Amino acid sequence: MFRGRKLRLPDGARPTQNRARIALFNMLDGIVGARDTLNVWDAFAGSGEFGIEFLSRRPMANVTFTDNAAASIKTVRTNVAPLDVGARANILMADAMTRIEQIAPNADLIFVDPPYDLSEIGARFVRRVGVAARVGTILVWEQDTDKFMLPDDAQWEILRDKTYGRARFLILQRRA
Protein backbone atom coordinates (compact mmCIF):
# COMPACT_ATOMS: atom_id res chain seq x y z
CA MET A 1 0.00 0.00 0.00
CA PHE A 2 2.83 2.43 0.84
CA ARG A 3 5.49 0.83 -1.39
CA GLY A 4 8.33 2.85 -2.76
CA ARG A 5 8.35 5.40 0.05
CA LYS A 6 11.73 6.24 1.51
CA LEU A 7 11.67 6.44 5.28
CA ARG A 8 13.67 9.04 7.10
CA LEU A 9 15.97 7.77 9.85
CA PRO A 10 16.90 9.50 13.09
CA ASP A 11 20.64 10.03 13.59
CA GLY A 12 22.31 6.85 14.79
CA ALA A 13 19.40 4.62 13.77
CA ARG A 14 20.10 1.17 12.41
CA PRO A 15 17.54 0.27 9.74
CA THR A 16 16.67 -3.39 9.33
CA GLN A 17 17.87 -4.82 6.02
CA ASN A 18 15.10 -4.91 3.43
CA ARG A 19 15.63 -8.65 2.88
CA ALA A 20 15.33 -9.34 6.60
CA ARG A 21 12.21 -7.19 6.97
CA ILE A 22 10.47 -8.92 4.04
CA ALA A 23 11.35 -12.37 5.41
CA LEU A 24 10.16 -11.37 8.89
CA PHE A 25 6.80 -10.13 7.62
CA ASN A 26 6.33 -13.25 5.52
CA MET A 27 6.87 -15.32 8.69
CA LEU A 28 4.44 -13.11 10.61
CA ASP A 29 1.81 -13.47 7.87
CA GLY A 30 2.00 -17.22 8.42
CA ILE A 31 1.64 -16.82 12.18
CA VAL A 32 -1.12 -14.20 12.46
CA GLY A 33 -2.95 -15.39 9.34
CA ALA A 34 -5.54 -13.33 7.53
CA ARG A 35 -6.56 -11.18 10.50
CA ASP A 36 -6.66 -7.61 9.27
CA THR A 37 -7.60 -6.09 12.62
CA LEU A 38 -4.51 -6.11 14.80
CA ASN A 39 -3.29 -3.88 17.59
CA VAL A 40 0.45 -3.50 17.10
CA TRP A 41 2.98 -1.86 19.42
CA ASP A 42 6.27 -0.66 17.92
CA ALA A 43 7.90 -0.27 21.32
CA PHE A 44 11.32 1.19 20.45
CA ALA A 45 10.11 2.83 17.26
CA GLY A 46 13.21 4.61 15.92
CA SER A 47 12.04 5.47 12.38
CA GLY A 48 8.78 3.55 12.81
CA GLU A 49 9.63 1.15 9.98
CA PHE A 50 8.02 -1.92 11.57
CA GLY A 51 4.80 -0.21 12.55
CA ILE A 52 4.56 1.49 9.15
CA GLU A 53 5.03 -1.86 7.42
CA PHE A 54 2.07 -3.20 9.40
CA LEU A 55 -0.06 -0.16 8.55
CA SER A 56 0.77 -0.86 4.91
CA ARG A 57 0.11 -4.60 4.94
CA ARG A 58 -2.94 -4.62 7.22
CA PRO A 59 -5.45 -1.87 6.32
CA MET A 60 -7.33 -2.34 9.60
CA ALA A 61 -4.26 -2.50 11.86
CA ASN A 62 -3.79 0.06 14.62
CA VAL A 63 -0.21 0.83 15.61
CA THR A 64 1.12 2.51 18.74
CA PHE A 65 4.64 3.88 18.30
CA THR A 66 6.71 4.67 21.40
CA ASP A 67 10.24 5.98 21.71
CA ASN A 68 11.91 8.05 24.41
CA ALA A 69 14.03 10.09 21.96
CA ALA A 70 12.50 13.31 20.65
CA ALA A 71 14.39 12.92 17.35
CA SER A 72 12.90 9.46 16.84
CA ILE A 73 9.35 10.63 17.56
CA LYS A 74 9.81 13.55 15.15
CA THR A 75 11.04 11.07 12.52
CA VAL A 76 8.09 8.72 13.08
CA ARG A 77 5.67 11.64 12.72
CA THR A 78 7.42 12.73 9.51
CA ASN A 79 7.28 9.18 8.12
CA VAL A 80 3.64 8.56 9.09
CA ALA A 81 2.18 11.96 8.07
CA PRO A 82 1.99 11.38 4.28
CA LEU A 83 0.35 7.97 4.73
CA ASP A 84 -3.05 9.40 5.69
CA VAL A 85 -3.76 6.69 8.27
CA GLY A 86 -5.50 8.97 10.75
CA ALA A 87 -6.20 7.44 14.15
CA ARG A 88 -4.69 4.10 13.10
CA ALA A 89 -1.30 5.51 14.21
CA ASN A 90 -0.81 6.60 17.82
CA ILE A 91 2.62 8.20 18.33
CA LEU A 92 3.84 8.68 21.91
CA MET A 93 7.07 10.11 23.21
CA ALA A 94 7.53 7.72 26.10
CA ASP A 95 9.90 5.19 27.56
CA ALA A 96 8.42 1.85 26.50
CA MET A 97 9.21 0.37 29.93
CA THR A 98 6.85 2.87 31.58
CA ARG A 99 3.97 2.08 29.21
CA ILE A 100 3.90 -1.72 29.44
CA GLU A 101 0.88 -1.91 31.75
CA GLN A 102 -1.14 0.50 29.56
CA ILE A 103 -0.27 -0.83 26.09
CA ALA A 104 0.74 -4.51 26.32
CA PRO A 105 -2.63 -5.91 27.52
CA ASN A 106 -4.31 -4.61 24.34
CA ALA A 107 -1.54 -5.52 21.89
CA ASP A 108 -1.84 -8.50 19.56
CA LEU A 109 1.71 -8.04 18.30
CA ILE A 110 4.68 -6.24 19.86
CA PHE A 111 7.96 -5.28 18.15
CA VAL A 112 10.97 -4.98 20.45
CA ASP A 113 14.00 -3.48 18.73
CA PRO A 114 16.04 -1.42 21.18
CA PRO A 115 19.46 -0.12 20.12
CA TYR A 116 21.89 -3.04 19.85
CA ASP A 117 24.12 -1.59 22.58
CA LEU A 118 21.14 -1.74 24.98
CA SER A 119 20.38 -5.45 24.69
CA GLU A 120 19.81 -5.81 28.45
CA ILE A 121 16.94 -3.30 28.22
CA GLY A 122 15.35 -5.54 25.60
CA ALA A 123 15.64 -8.54 27.92
CA ARG A 124 14.08 -6.64 30.85
CA PHE A 125 11.31 -5.36 28.59
CA VAL A 126 10.47 -8.87 27.34
CA ARG A 127 10.31 -10.16 30.94
CA ARG A 128 7.97 -7.36 32.04
CA VAL A 129 5.76 -7.58 28.94
CA GLY A 130 5.35 -11.30 29.64
CA VAL A 131 3.49 -10.40 32.84
CA ALA A 132 1.19 -7.80 31.24
CA ALA A 133 0.50 -9.31 27.81
CA ARG A 134 -2.49 -11.51 27.03
CA VAL A 135 -2.09 -15.19 26.29
CA GLY A 136 -1.48 -15.55 22.56
CA THR A 137 0.24 -12.17 22.11
CA ILE A 138 3.04 -12.35 19.53
CA LEU A 139 6.32 -10.60 20.31
CA VAL A 140 9.11 -9.99 17.78
CA TRP A 141 12.48 -9.31 19.39
CA GLU A 142 15.29 -8.08 17.14
CA GLN A 143 18.77 -8.38 18.60
CA ASP A 144 22.42 -8.16 17.58
CA THR A 145 23.76 -11.66 16.94
CA ASP A 146 26.84 -10.76 19.04
CA LYS A 147 24.72 -9.90 22.11
CA PHE A 148 21.93 -12.41 21.64
CA MET A 149 19.76 -13.41 24.63
CA LEU A 150 16.93 -15.88 25.00
CA PRO A 151 13.95 -14.99 27.18
CA ASP A 152 14.81 -16.22 30.67
CA ASP A 153 11.33 -17.20 31.77
CA ALA A 154 8.64 -19.68 30.83
CA GLN A 155 6.09 -17.05 29.77
CA TRP A 156 7.15 -17.16 26.13
CA GLU A 157 7.18 -19.94 23.57
CA ILE A 158 9.72 -19.52 20.76
CA LEU A 159 7.89 -19.83 17.43
CA ARG A 160 10.77 -18.81 15.16
CA ASP A 161 14.46 -17.96 15.54
CA LYS A 162 16.07 -16.51 12.39
CA THR A 163 19.30 -14.65 11.68
CA TYR A 164 19.88 -12.19 8.82
CA GLY A 165 23.34 -10.65 8.84
CA ARG A 166 23.83 -8.99 12.24
CA ALA A 167 20.13 -9.14 13.09
CA ARG A 168 18.63 -12.08 14.94
CA PHE A 169 14.86 -12.26 15.24
CA LEU A 170 12.99 -14.20 17.88
CA ILE A 171 9.27 -14.54 17.31
CA LEU A 172 7.65 -15.44 20.62
CA GLN A 173 4.11 -16.17 21.74
CA ARG A 174 2.78 -15.56 25.26
CA ARG A 175 1.94 -18.89 26.87
CA ALA A 176 -1.07 -19.72 29.01
Where are these regions (language model features)?
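Class I S-adenosyl-L-methionine-dependent methyltransferase catalytic core
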Residues: M1-A176
